[in-house]
Swiss-Prot record:
Binds to bile acids and is involved in enterohepatic bile acid metabolism. Required for efficient apical to basolateral transport of conjugated bile acids in ileal enterocytes. Stimulates gastric acid and pepsinogen secretion. It is found in: Cytoplasm; Membrane. This is Gastrotropin. CDD domains: FABP6. The modification N-acetylalanine is found at A2. Transmembrane segments: none annotated. The keyword Membrane applies. Keywords: Acetylation, Cytoplasm, Lipid transport, Lipid-binding, Membrane, Transport.
Amino acid sequence: MAFTGKYEIESEKNYDEFMKRLALPSDAIDKARNLKIISEVKQDGQNFTWSQQYPGGHSITNTFTIGKECDIETIGGKKFKATVQMEGGKVVVNSPNYHHTAEIVDGKLVEVSTVGGVTYERVSKKLA
């Protein structure tokens, strides 16, 4: 299923524990809790531009092609190289320290990230 669209966070699971695992400061974790982050995805075949826009103007954008190595930036600001794959309709990022999947389920963007044995799930509703 095509990923293109603009999505707003609707629900999160295990936010605090995951953000602590990323070694984010407690004040940043508290400040970001319940923010309405907008994810904008542009898909052109195997090419993706995946942006997250935070209130206050901060954003992160990752551009990648399925099957090719790229640089990925996490919500914690860390950067690493990974080869993004498409597996069963899911976008999959796998590295030694980070695992992330994203898929469209009932029109919603469902993302699951795991770091150091801690899993975080975010569900976003489609805006456009």
